[in-house]
Amino acid sequence: MSGKMQDEMNISFNKSLVTNELPSGDALKVRLGNWEQGRDSSAATSSGDALKVRLGNWLLDNPVIPASGTFGYGYEFAELYDINCLGTFSFKGTTLEPRFGNPTPRIAECPAGIINSIGLQNPGVDAVINNELPRLKRCFSKQVIANVSGFSIHEYTEVAARFNECEQVGIIEVNISCPNVHNGGMSFGTTCDAAAEVTKAVKSVVQKPIFIKLSPNVTDIVSIAKACEDAGADGLSLINTLMGMRIDLHRRTPVIANKKGGFSGSAIFPVALKTVYDVYEAVKIPIMGIGGVSSADDVLEMMLAGAAAVQIGAANLIEPYICRDIIRELPSTMKKYGINKLEDIIGGAHNG
């Protein structure tokens, strides 16, 4: 395994590596529904208006969002760089009670990706609210995305309702697609009726926007996405990991203890891109594109396919600076392809 890999994001960073030179102003802002996220518009540069991206009234400094499970609770990365450069981030998936997760080894690097079966390890919603979010607040001034998981409708609604009361939380991301836990979560994401049921239940107990995170391990993700929209979802996050495994040829056993796990990384980017493209044609709510993104070019492709913002997952585990670097590279990459406004390219690949 590469020396850059981190299991569970228990990372000790060198503060001397922190650098904060990023594009200023409104150059890379994005709107997601009704949630405004970003600096005051007075900070805009002369080219800021030309580079803004809007979708409803939600606003981000840029479309780059570290994905849940690959960025810890954010403060770990704050020792590396100023995480306020991010659009926002989705913190580690949270359940009602603490979970120790699956046996180890539960994460392994393989060509073009990573296989993991963490098992939703987390301290539980009360500990996240009382301990993790206050610590994050000292280094991150923006609202974040709370990723919630559950093993029953009651658990989903309980966790979501508690995060709904948190000022630091701007969006609640409902994970109905986690492939790592036996007899939980995944069942809600495999049928239209089950996905709609959890969506409607969570929507009934919160006022904050909810984004439903969908699994690609289904026969018709477009129908499930549409069912979530009809049930009241404010947006969608897709895709979660594909199912996969690798076998150690020396031991002749699977490389992770749980045998199978979620496969993520650059190899799944074409699958994720196609899924975003297909779902965009079927729904009117915003999409956060996820899956194999590792460059500014990938971000632009995702947005052309229909994503309003882009989450970056496995790449964070391989290169912890990747989100910061992509944000830095976006202006020059946009110029390279003759893109003047990010808002103009959302869904642009559907026009041909």
Regions found by a protein language model. Give the residues of each.
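N-terminal capping/small domains of soluble enzymes
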Residues: 2-15, 20, 49-144, 149-151, ...
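Alpha/beta catalytic cores of nucleotide-metabolism and tRNA/nucleoside-modifying enzymes
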Residues: 2-18, 48, 263-283, 294-352
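Short beta-strand/loop segments at the ligand-binding rim of alpha/beta enzyme cores
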Residues: 61-65, 140-145, 205-215, 281-290
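Conserved, mostly hydrophobic/aromatic
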Residues: 66, 89, 128, 146, ...
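Glycine-rich beta-to-alpha transition loops that act as phosphate-gripper elements at the mouths
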Residues: 71, 147-150, 214-220, 269, ...
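Catalytic cores of alpha/beta
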Residues: 76-77, 158-163, 219-231, 281-282, ...
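Glycine/Thr-rich beta-alpha phosphate-binding loop at enzyme active sites
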Residues: 114, 178-193, 224-285
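Alpha-helix-loop-beta-strand connector modules within alpha/beta enzyme cores
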Residues: 125-139, 190-210, 256-285, 326-338
